[in-house]
Amino acid sequence: MKKVLLLGDSIRIGYGKLVSDLLSDVAEVVQPVENCKWTKYLYWNFAIWAGETKYDLIHWNSGIWDMHYIDNNECFCSLEEYVRDNERLLQLIRKYSQKLVWATTIPGGKILNQRKAHNVLINTNREFPVRMLTTDQDTWNCGVQKYNQAAREYYKINGVKIDDLFSVMQEHLEDYLSEDGIHPNDKGYEALAQHAADTIRRELSF
């Protein structure tokens, strides 16, 4: 039985159990209960989540937390910082597996045009101020694509396979998103899980 490590934020938590079930005939899927949040946080905690184990494949994503705006209208992590953090992360991950798959960050929905002053990742109660904000849909998704492209280029050059979850969601965006405009609904999670599982299964077969 192969061993796979699956890492990512709350969206990974949403599709993780489904991925594990879909791959149960070929792999044991190890994943933390904890939200892996932004890239630096994933890097900091990676050894804790991975343990003293070598994996046949590691599949991961980080990005949505990095891309959130702070109250001076700047991203929590600049694009340059995001790329540098991913460079550091890859150096670490390579010590645990030679088969690596990085998943793109998914787009946001049109509800962001109405909720841009509130961060649904942190608190659902609008009465409480939050310092981490989203923005309107077009600006948000433009940023997601920019960060995705920068990381994709780096990872492709370095032999990491890309799992394009952005495109999976984009084709049926409003049908696959929940009411918060950031997290998928059940249909969205099922589509992401199937795509991730198919990607992992294909890479494990080589």
Task: Label the model's feature ranges.
Residues 1-59, 190-191:
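Serine-esterase "nucleophile elbow" of acetyl-processing enzymes
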Residues 22-25, 44-206:
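Alpha-helical cap/lid subdomain in secreted, periplasmic
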